């Protein structure tokens, strides 16, 4: 079983998590890294437009995301996700659910938490939040990191920022002797 590096991309909606995750995944695969991309369950539901009450079922949504991540851990060298488990805590006001999301997100010892600094214009297509709400989630994520002693790094949500992260991941794997 491999000791998978879990790369968690954090930011509010529209900051570039999905774009960055796809870009980073593609760059790693093209470099010969055994990597997998775990996409956002909640986004799948938004595109289905079936009025599934995401806000009222955050624990379910987070559980589905957790399953997506868990099923590939130990099978590849790197997993990149645009929907870290702990980010589920941003979408509920119920403390036990918030705590469960954060606890589940912190359990991965071999992880890299990356905050994407918003650089592009906000596109509301496929989102449930306004630009102001998305920026407020950015602030809540930074507070979550601080309040829960979660280590993280920040990169710009740009091609250069994503390239920097690809190099960090490749260097990490080289140090571990995996690539």
Short names for language-model regions:
Residues 17:
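Conserved lysine of the Walker
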Residues 39, 81-83, 116:
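Active-site flanking residues adjacent to catalytic metal/cofactor-binding acidic residues
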Residues 9:
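Hydrophobic anchor at the beta1->P-loop junction of P-loop NTPases
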Residues 22-66:
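Conserved substrate/cofactor phosphate-moiety recognition/catalytic segment
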Residues 50-96:
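Conserved nucleotide-sensing/catalytic segment adjacent to the nucleotide-binding pocket
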Residues 13:
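The conserved Walker
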Residues 95-173:
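A glycine- and Lys/Arg-enriched "phosphate-lid" helix/loop adjacent to the NTP-binding pocket
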Residues 1-6:
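Phosphate-binding P-loop
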């Amino acid at each position: 079983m491999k000791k998978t590096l879990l790369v968690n991309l954090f930011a509010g909606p529209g900051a570039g998590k999905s774009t960055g995750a796809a870009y980073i995944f593609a760059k790693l695969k093209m470099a010969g890294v055994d990597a997998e991309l775990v996409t956002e369950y909640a986004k799948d539901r938004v595109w289905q437009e079936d009025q599934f009450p995401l806000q009222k079922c955050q624990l379910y949504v987070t559980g589905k995301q957790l399953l997506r991540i868990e099923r590939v851990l130990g099978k590849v060298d790197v997993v990149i996700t645009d929907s870290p488990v702990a980010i589920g805590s941003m979408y509920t006001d119920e403390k036990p659910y918030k705590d469960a999301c954060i606890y589940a997100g912190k359990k991965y010892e071999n992880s890299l938490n990356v905050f994407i600094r918003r650089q592009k214009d906000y596109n509301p297509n496929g989102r449930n939040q306004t630009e102001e709400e998305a920026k407020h989630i950015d602030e809540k994520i930074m507070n979550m990191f601080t309040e829960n002693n979660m280590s993280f790094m920040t990169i710009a949500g740009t091609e250069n920022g994503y390239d920097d992260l690809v190099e960090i991941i490749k260097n990490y794997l080289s140090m571990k002797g995996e690539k």
